[in-house]
Swiss-Prot record:
InterPro entries noted in UniProt: F-box-like_dom_sf, F-box_dom, SCF_F-box_component
Matches recorded under Pfam families: F-box
Name of the molecule in the record: F-box protein At1g20360
F-box domain boundaries: 1-48
């Protein structure tokens, strides 16, 4: 393959899966050098579809952060995490950046392989999640209170502080933690939905509550509002999923019971419009949990 023109070689290599491309490094030095070129890496990874990281709720102990293609002379962050017996948690992702917890908070760029450590000592909320010595998250189900927003090449981390019907917001813009002057009060008490990450849409983070209402907060303007629920009361067996419909650029709320699955779209007047309702598949009573229900939603709608 050494005799092939570079543009033809690129077209061949661009068609390879990451695993096959990594194996090409051992073929000869010329191809290894070509694959390791930053320009080739940038073009290759820009052609890849989005991938999913399979992290268990208790954190992944064996997560490798070493890239597939580039040579890495120093020990990667993932290898350090394994040797330190740290667990890896993905707290959020936005615009190609990842918010990771590996014995501490990191904002990482998987393409450039750069990361930034964030000192959590000034935060009121982050230390409440951690176990001894920051090795693991003691309350990962509450880690969904952490929002991650990236806009105009800047990132902000927003932690929502829940106190009965009152909500405060803690912000980190990369330099320090501070408490926003903005607070919001709800008419009734309803806990934030556990294990449900906030949805980032049009510059605003949205946290779902168990009654179907939503706490919305804009990290730039620091304005907050309560989006009312489309339901009159909480149904015991009802499961809720908040998402963003990229096609119409609106929030979508999916509710599921043992009988039906309903899809609602947030309209301009802050009211929910029923977009679709279908009969639910048969599930055993002990199988109707959040994980099973989310998998069912994925198979039905996506």
């Amino acid at each position: 393959m050494n005799s092939l023109p570079l543009h033809l070689l690129d077209q061949i290599l661009f068609r390879l899966e990451p695993k096959s491309l990594a194996m090409m490094k051992s073929t000869n030095r010329t191809i290894n050098s070509h694959i390791s070129d930053p320009l080739f890496e940038s073009e290759y990874f820009s052609r890849l579809e989005s991938s999913l990281y399979n992290l268990s709720p208790g954190g992944a102990r064996y997560v490798m952060c070493q890239p597939l293609v580039s040579s890495c002379k120093s020990m990667s962050m993932g290898e350090k995490a394994i040797q330190g017996n740290f667990r890896c948690y993905m707290l959020g992702s936005c615009s190609g950046l990842l918010l990771l917890y590996i014995g501490g908070l990191f904002v990482a760029n998987p393409l450039t392989k750069r990361f930034r450590y964030l000192d959590p000592s000034g935060s009121k909320f982050i230390p409440t999640l951690s176990g001894d010595r920051w090795i693991y998250l003691a309350h990962p189900e509450r880690a969904m209170c952490v929002g991650f927003a990236v806009d105009r090449k800047r990132f902000k981390i927003v932690c929502i502080l829940e106190m009965e019907t009152r909500y405060e917001f803690e912000i980190n813009d990369g330099d320090s933690w501070r408490l926003s002057k903005t607070t919001i009060n709800a008419d009734s008490k309803s806990d934030l939905t556990k294990w449900m990450k906030p949805v980032y849409l049009e510059g605003t983070l949205h946290w779902l509550r168990n009654d179907g209402s939503i706490i919305a907060f804009n990290p730039e303007t620091e304005q907050a509002r309560l989006i009312p629920s489309g339901f009159h009361q909480e149904v015991p067996d009802m499961k809720l999923l908040l998402a963003a419909d990229d096609k119409i650029n609106r929030l979508t709320l999916i509710s599921g019971t043992k009988q039906t699955i309903s899809v609602y779209t947030l309209l301009g007047n802050l009211k929910w419009g029923l977009a679709r309702r279908i009969k639910n598949v048969s599930l055993k009573e002990n199988e109707l949990n959040a994980g099973t229900w989310l998998c069912t939603m994925a198979s039905v709608f996506w």
